[in-house]
Amino acid sequence: MAFLKKSLFLVLFLGLVSLSICDEEKRQDEDDDDDDDEEKRGVIDIIKGAGKDLIAHAIGKLAEKV
């Protein structure tokens, strides 16, 4: 009976260790995805800002001519 308890304990322990390793890898993958999303948002914000500046400059030039 003691042998079965030790075996069961060992199986449960190894299962918990493998689960914790998988969780760590999952967190790292999620962090990498978050970094990519932040970079995409940064590029889009730059493009939007440049577009707004370009439109404002064009409107300013048109207003000067009128």
Curated annotation (Swiss-Prot):
One of its GO terms (biological process) is symbiont-mediated hemolysis of host erythrocyte. The modification Valine amide is found at V66. The keyword Signal applies. It is found in: Secreted. Residues 1-22 form the signal peptide. One of its GO terms (cellular component) is extracellular region. Residues 23-39 form a propeptide. Keywords: Amidation, Amphibian defense peptide, Antibiotic, Antimicrobial, Cleavage on pair of basic residues, Secreted, Signal. InterPro entries: Antimicrobial15, Frog_antimicrobial_propeptide, FSAP. It comes from the Eukaryota. Its main location: secreted. Expressed by the skin glands. Belongs to the frog skin active peptide (FSAP) family. Ocellatin subfamily. Has antibacterial activity against Gram-negative bacterium E.coli ATCC 25922 (MIC=320 uM) but not against S.pneumoniae ATCC 700603, S.choleraesuis ATCC 14028 or Gram-positive bacterium S.aureus ATCC 29313. Shows no hemolytic activity and no cytotoxicity. This is Ocellatin-PT3. It comes from Leptodactylus pustulatus.
